[in-house]
């Protein structure tokens, strides 16, 4: 039998002669040159075609690529892209003009009729500032405007309070140093326009010389009279007058609040040391020079007047200044007419306090003739209805010596109107405010640094989850105990208040009883006197003693003891009210301090408020966060194709390019195999025929089968066999074996002509990587230091796992709900079907198809 040899190649392997054996021959599995077993019964099981093997290899690679697309680090890298996009959106959002948001505040108790709250605690912080948390409140619903005759809601009050909020990081209390320069105010008689000019020698305008002062790094500029300032060592540094004088600390003020641990003393209504003269109908008549007390800038000549258009009128002037930045505060000018002014030391400048129903304006006036005064609203000193003492950490009030005075309103009638308002601890409410109300929060710098900080915070939370849980558990226990303690204290204060009221009622009953006893004593004494003297003539109504009436009859001896008791009771009543208010204020301050997040253990609890502070307006509604979370989840889970395409674009390699290179490689490899197979076939034929070409062509065109076990084939030279074996071993290198077993691995790069080269890969000059940029390979190379691609970390994986778990739970819940609805529908359908069949059966029974009842017939 003649054997025919076919020469083909396994991709990436050895091209060996494929032999067809006879039916009697057996397959020898250990034969290197017979990889396929052939017989007449299974002629179709010969070597597969090259295209089929290439297609199978491509399918395997695509299946592996599809599996690798679900790796977790891809999702982590997508989360990084999502975080960057979110940061860009937030960066853009922070640049938009918007309404300022200062977060949650806690408002404590207040007094009836005062219109003032005792404390406000801001939970938000100001960027780059020292802690500025305790505020006092004022009514923001009052409008600021100038009517025909008065300036409502004192602008100095508004400006100073507003500026405290706006520049809290620079300690904007008025006893700081200012950089001032002298200026002139020039105006023409025909207009109300005033020009501000920088000069060395100043002249008076409106009765005063003027300074232009800057504070807080030129953020605020004020135009102020020299009389309100004091120069320091002949430099350009000035401080407000009164900072080194004695300040008034009132003993019994209705309001006594705390600024941190520092007191803020408030006195309201007309100033306690200045009153209007009694019995004078003219409201412009003032008197009482007053004690030597300094509230800001108060000269020795002081007076008080009601806000009346007859006394003072607003003079509207337009201040023209060169270009400036920040706030430029201009004064308010008044023209006043005062009659019968009594000067204590004959000085032309006096301080006038003009009070109205809801405001107090402090004026600095200069006499230009007998009764006419030019007045300017003071920039410092008393603000609104309250005098503030705001000490600074480094520059405090110099030579602090406080005089004790009693408020004139602390009589029995006036004090009873100041009752404590019942409060239940601290009430949180959100505050958002425009610039004209004073509660201002400048936008926080937000950008990539904040995103990095958020990622670091997330890592810290993930690393210390157990410790944070334990700490928060302990904090919750402490909070519960302290809340119960505050409730007990609040109930105690309420009980003390009720006891105080009960004492008042008891005191009134005692007074009434005392009056009745006095009357009884007087009547008894008169009757005893009449009984001693006797009656000359007695009727049922009259008793005529015959003696003239003596004034001592019926007059009881006066005792100062009872009056002392009454005075002490009134004093104790006032002390009780003061103590109750102080206790209430301390309780509110304790609640504020307690509710202020100030420990690491409360960081997790406080994280939500920090997010609300970073994203103004959005933090006020938890619904928006929930909606945003659901949208992100739907985007990540419902759009896998879009995400896959996005990832292919961002990964950089592109699978299409790698496939093209692989196809080029396979084509070159196939053509090289064909050439090599032909050469090996010629070598084999040469060995078989002994170099005879005629014998080769005879065997080629012969129809007889060729058997590879022929004697001529077995008698081929030993050297040729060894060369074939050596060539096979060199062709199947370790790298090539790896490619056959792992089609996704890389092929060794082409080496040029020296030492260990494969002469059959001379045309291969390509460097192929699996899919050109797989994340797994990139991360491996990044760990080896050959490629700088960031691999994903544990926090992102943890966050992604949390998102998937929550989504899966929600999905299971929805699917369970769908199953329940489906079961209910099937049950209802079954019930309806049973009812239908019963009705149909009853109907058929009552209405049969043929009637078996025969009707009677009449013949």
UniProtKB/Swiss-Prot annotation:
Annotated S-S bridges: none
Positions in the Cytoplasmic compartment: 636-859
Positions glycosylated per UniProt: 40, 112, 141, 148, 186, 214, 233, 244, 340, 368, 399, 406, 411, 483, 490, 550, 557
The keyword NADP is assigned to this record: no
Proregion positions: 1-6
Molecular-function GO term, any one: structural molecule activity
Entry's transmembrane regions: 615-635
UniProt region (Disordered), positions on chain: 47-66
Domain of life per record: Viruses
Composition bias type Basic and acidic residues, residue spans: 48-66
A Gene Ontology cellular-component term: host cell plasma membrane
Region described as Fusion peptide: 446-466
Stated name of the protein: Envelope glycoprotein
Organism: Equine infectious anemia virus (isolate CL22)
Lineage: Viruses, Riboviria, Pararnavirae, Artverviricota, Revtraviricetes
């Amino acid at each position: 039998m003649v054997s025919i040899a076919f020469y083909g190649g396994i991709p990436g392997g050895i091209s060996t002669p494929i032999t067809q054996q006879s039916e009697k021959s057996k397959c020898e599995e250990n034969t290197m040159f017979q990889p396929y077993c052939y017989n007449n019964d299974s002629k179709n099981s010969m070597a597969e075609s090259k295209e089929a093997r290439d297609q199978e290899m491509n399918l395997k690679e695509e299946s592996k690529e599809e599996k690798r697309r679900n790796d977790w680090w891809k999702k982590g890298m997508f989360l990084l892209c999502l975080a960057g996009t979110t940061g860009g959106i937030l960066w853009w959002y922070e640049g938009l003009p918007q309404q300022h948001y200062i977060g949650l505040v806690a408002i404590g108790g207040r007094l009836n009729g005062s219109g003032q709250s005792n404390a406000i605690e801001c939970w938000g912080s100001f960027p780059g500032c020292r802690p500025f948390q305790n505020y006092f409140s004022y009514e923001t619903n009052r409008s600021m405007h100038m009517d025909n005759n008065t300036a409502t809601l004192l602008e100095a009050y508004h400006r100073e309070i507003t500026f405290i909020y706006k520049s809290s990081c620079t300690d904007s209390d008025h006893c700081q140093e200012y950089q001032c320069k002298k200026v002139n105010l020039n105006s023409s008689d025909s207009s109300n326009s005033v020009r501000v000019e920088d000069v060395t020698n100043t002249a008076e305008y409106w009765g005063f010389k003027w300074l232009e002062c800057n504070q807080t790094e030129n953020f605020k500029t004020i135009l102020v009279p020299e009389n309100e300032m004091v120069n320091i060592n002949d430099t350009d540094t000035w401080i407000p007058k009164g900072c080194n004088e004695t300040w008034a600390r009132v003993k019994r003020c209705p309001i006594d609040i705390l600024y941190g641990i520092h007191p803020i003393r408030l006195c309201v209504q007309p100033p306690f040391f200045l009153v209007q003269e009694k019995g004078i109908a003219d409201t412009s008549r003032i008197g009482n020079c007053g004690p030597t007390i300094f509230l800001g800038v108060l000269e020795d000549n002081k007076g008080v007047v009601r806000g009346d258009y007859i006394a003072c009128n607003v003079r509207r002037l337009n201040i023209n200044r060169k270009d400036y930045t920040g706030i430029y505060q201009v004064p308010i000018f008044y023209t006043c007419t005062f009659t019968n002014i009594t000067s204590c030391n004959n000085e032309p400048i006096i301080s006038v306090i003009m009070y109205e129903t809801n405001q107090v304006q402090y004026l600095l006036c200069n006499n230009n003739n007998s009764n006419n005064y030019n007045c300017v609203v003071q920039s410092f000193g008393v603000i609104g209805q309250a005098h503030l003492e705001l000490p600074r950490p480094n520059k405090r009030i110099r030579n602090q010596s406080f005089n004790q005075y009693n408020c004139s309103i602390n009589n029995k009638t006036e004090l009873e109107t100041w009752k404590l308002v019942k409060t239940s601890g601290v009430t949180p409410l959100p505050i958002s405010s425009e610039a004209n109300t004073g509660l201002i929060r400048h936008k926080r710098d937000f950008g990539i640094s904040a995103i990095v900080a958020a990622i670091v915070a997330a890592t810290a939370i993930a690393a210390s989850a157990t410790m944070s849980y334990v700490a928060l558990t302990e904090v919750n226990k402490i909070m519960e105990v302290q809340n119960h303690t505050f409730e007990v204290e609040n109930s105690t204060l309420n009980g003390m208040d009720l006891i105080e009221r009960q004492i008042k009622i008891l005191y009134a009953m005692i007074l009434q009883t005392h009056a009745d006893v006095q009357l009884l004593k007087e009547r008894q004494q008169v009757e005893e006197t009449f009984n001693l003297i006797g009656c000359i003539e007695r009727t049922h109504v009259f008793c005529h003693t015959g003696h003239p009436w003596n004034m001592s009859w019926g007059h009881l001896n006066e005792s100062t003891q009872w009056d002392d008791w009454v005075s002490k009771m009134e004093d104790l009543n006032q002390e009780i009210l003061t103590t109750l208010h102080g206790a209430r204020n301390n309780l509110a301050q304790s609640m504020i301090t307690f509710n202020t997040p100030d420990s690491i253990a409360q960081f997790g609890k406080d994280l939500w408020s920090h997010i609300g502070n970073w994203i103004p307006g959005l933090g006020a509604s938890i619904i928006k966060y929930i909606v945003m979370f659901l949208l992100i989840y739907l985007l990540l889970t419902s759009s896998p194709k879009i995400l896959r395409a996005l990832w292919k674009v961002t990964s950089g390699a592109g699978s299409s390019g790698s496939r093209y290179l692989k196809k080029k490689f396979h084509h070159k490899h196939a053509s090289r195999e064909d050439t090599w197979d032909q050469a090996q076939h010629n070598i084999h034929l040469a060995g078989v025929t002994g170099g005879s070409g005629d014998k080769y062509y005879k065997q080629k065109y012969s129809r007889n089968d060729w058997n590879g076990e022929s004697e001529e084939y077995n008698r081929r030279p030993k050297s040729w066999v060894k060369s074939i074996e050596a060539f096979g071993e060199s062709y199947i290198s370790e790298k090539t074996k790896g490619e056959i077993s792992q089609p996704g691995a890389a092929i060794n790069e082409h080496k040029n002509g020296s030492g260990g080269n494969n002469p059959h890969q001379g045309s291969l000059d390509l460097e192929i990587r699996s899919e050109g940029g797989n994340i797994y390979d990139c991360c491996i190379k990044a760990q080896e230091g050959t490629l700088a691609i960031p691999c994903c970390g544990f926090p992102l994986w943890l966050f992604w796992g949390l998102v998937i778990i929550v989504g899966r739970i929600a999905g299971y819940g929805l699917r369970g709900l769908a199953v329940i609805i489906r079961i209910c529908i099937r049950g209802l359908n079954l019930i309806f079907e049973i009812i239908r069949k019963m009705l149909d059966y009853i109907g058929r029974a009552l209405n049969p198809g043929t009637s078996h009842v025969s009707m009677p017939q009449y013949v």
